[in-house]
Design a protein with these regions (language model features):
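Feature marking well-ordered beta-strand scaffolds used for ligand recognition
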Residues: 1-192
Length: 192
């Protein structure tokens, strides 16, 4: 081991964003001092000096103790999308699920977060929702689409659960949405 870095939480996936493999985006979980997991965390690390790596920036999705967030990108690297926009700058596209444990369901979200990332910081550019409302529960067959994103001609196409959404990269406006049909036999439904 060349070096270590003490930070709260941990990254389960690291992605290099420069040619020297010294600037890394990390996706993982934030944790408190006791090690209890608090939710999704995106970090930017500088490993120019391997003996003394640094966390340059980090953001967490949670805004309060009654909120939980997660991303399939923490365990499925194909769910992670990096769009290079120049030297050490780009867009990070992640599938994100946010759940509020309160009666107010307005904090719930199921879709994708798009972050602007550079050495100067990490900022949320837009969110792309894959649900009609804050209600996650619905009747679908158990065949779900893997959480993926692609960029074509200035549009982000996101795939998650039972829908595909195309969103303009610059304006954030939804171009179209395709929903998988619900099964005719409602007895075979799975609810989540």
């Amino acid at each position: 081991m060349l070096g270590e870095l003490k930070v709260t939480g941990f990254s389960t996936y690291l992605h290099s964003i420069n040619e020297n493999n010294t600037l890394l985006v990390g996706v993982g979980e934030e944790a408190d001092q006791t090690g209890s997991i608090l939710g999704l965390k995106v970090s930017l690390f500088d490993a120019t000096d391997p003996a003394s790596p640094k966390q340059l920036k980090s953001v967490t999705v949670e805004k309060d103790k009654d909120t939980w967030s997660s991303s399939d990108a923490t365990f499925d690297f194909k769910a992670f999308r990096w769009l290079n926009l120049g030297v050490e700058t780009g867009l990070l596209i992640l599938p994100v699920r946010v759940e509020s444990w309160t009666q107010d369901q307005n904090g719930n979200f199921d879709g994708f977060y798009v972050y602007d990332v550079s050495r100067d910081g990490i900022s949320l550019r837009m969110t792309i929702s894959h649900v009609q409302s804050q209600d996650f529960f619905g009747c679908y067959a158990s065949a779900t689409l893997p959480q993926r994103s692609m960029v074509f001609d200035g549009n982000i196409m996101t795939v998650k659960g039972h829908s595909i959404v195309s969103t303009n990269l610059d304006s954030g406006k939804k171009s179209w949405k395709l929903e998988m049909p619900k099964p005719e036999n409602q007895d075979s439904c799975m609810y989540w």
